[in-house]
Amino acid sequence: MTERKYFGTDGVRAVAGEFPLTPAWVMALGAAAGEVFKRRNPRASVVIGKDTRQSGDMLEAALAAGLTSRGVNVVHLGVLPTPGVSYLTRHLGAEAGVVISASHNPYEDNGIKFFGPGGGKLSDATELEIEAAIDEAATLAPVTGVNLGSVTNYTEAERLYTAFLSSHAPDLSGMRIALDCANGAAYRVAPKVFQQAGADVFAVYTTPDGRNINRGCGSTHMDHLRLIVREGDYDLGIAFDGDADRALFVDSRGNMIHGDHMLLLSARARGEKAVVATIMTNMALEVKLQEAGLTLERTAVGDRYVHERLHAKGLNLGGEQSGHVLFLDVSPTGDGVLTALLTLSSMKKLGTTLDALYDELVMFPQTLVNVRVKDKKAIASDPAVQHAVADAEKQLAGKGRINLRPSGTENLIRVMVEGQDEGEIHDIAAAVAKVVEERGAAGA
């Protein structure tokens, strides 16, 4: 596949104001995207939503200027979770949706992510076409006068998205729930949905100021939520990240409930035959699924790979420990608030609690060793390394697993070993890491 110049695995992301997220470049991106969308649909409209970062307004204005300069009509949705933009893209029949967000990153960062007409990921071919159009922007014939696009503010976006979420909410009457909204995109939507479902809700981090998104809060900083739940006698707590495409729970005792727990609970309640997760998913989940006659499909790390495998196999349920969980029969993209609601629906259907789930799914000990090498690509095919891995697998005897994977950004090999005996897995990881280090130092 042709290598991308600007788009990463999750759109374009950088420090706001630095290339490529400068107003001039984002305007060029908007013009390029507008040109591509107009080729497909001469009456194209694009919806734009954003999280609560202070740079969102600047980038939104630049993007809208570029899109309208090519004759595309822009519909502003305002502050809305990323999956809400996906929902409105398909609900309004837009040619595309755009989210201005950097998810769980600090406020200085921002990003631009596109959805296709159905609210799913923009195709690789379309992304490459947009990249080519950016580089050709100077040669495009100008659009003028009545042919320019319009800009409107859609004031019903939050209400419609909230109604969609509420349609999937169980009856939460009598439940005391604490929410951490990360000062992000879900700060209004999440408390409203859980209150409408009947829960007694205590919501924190619901006062965004443009700079406090994810700061010491949200799904990557859950210590405060755990304390609130323990000391406040809540049934459970739920934390979202800045753009609310993921969710993590804590049980009534403050224990972390992550994606592996949610996948087990949902697979049982929804009658799934198989679940898709990643190579980092704990083996305890695999064992529990096997006991229930279910299979676990593993992919590379990243929710996009989980998504691709679900589509390829015609499956519905998959996710990662981070709280990115996909229910493709309900939504084409990860949705933190929806994930929380569907998880609670599964819990109520099975008549269980998050406390019981935590106690049942006891994670296998896992150790990770990073080894610096000269050529990370050559390590996988090195005979000595392959022999060391084979020896490790024999020692684990089906009661554990070993995985070697290269870092995406550094010349590192990550050696992960998982098993029932913590001392044994540390010894195995050290032995394999030593071989990797020796072979890696030699350039393999």
Curated annotation (Swiss-Prot):
Its EC number is 5.4.2.10. The modification Phosphoserine is found at S103. Binds 1 Mg(2+) ion per subunit. Mg(2+) binds at S103, D241, D243, D245. InterPro entries: A-D-PHexomutase_a/b/a-I, A-D-PHexomutase_a/b/a-I/II/III, A-D-PHexomutase_a/b/a-II, A-D-PHexomutase_a/b/a-III, A-D-PHexomutase_C, A-D-PHexomutase_C_sf, A-D-PHexomutase_CS, Alpha-D-phosphohexomutase_SF. GO terms for cellular component: cytosol. Its cofactor is Mg(2+). GO terms for molecular function: magnesium ion binding; phosphoglucosamine mutase activity; phosphomannomutase activity. It catalyses: alpha-D-glucosamine 1-phosphate = D-glucosamine 6-phosphate. The active site is at S103 (phosphoserine intermediate). Activated by phosphorylation. One of its GO terms (biological process) is carbohydrate metabolic process. Keywords: Isomerase, Magnesium, Metal-binding, Phosphoprotein. It is an enzyme of class 5 (isomerase). Belongs to the phosphohexose mutase family. Catalyzes the conversion of glucosamine-6-phosphate to glucosamine-1-phosphate. This is Phosphoglucosamine mutase.
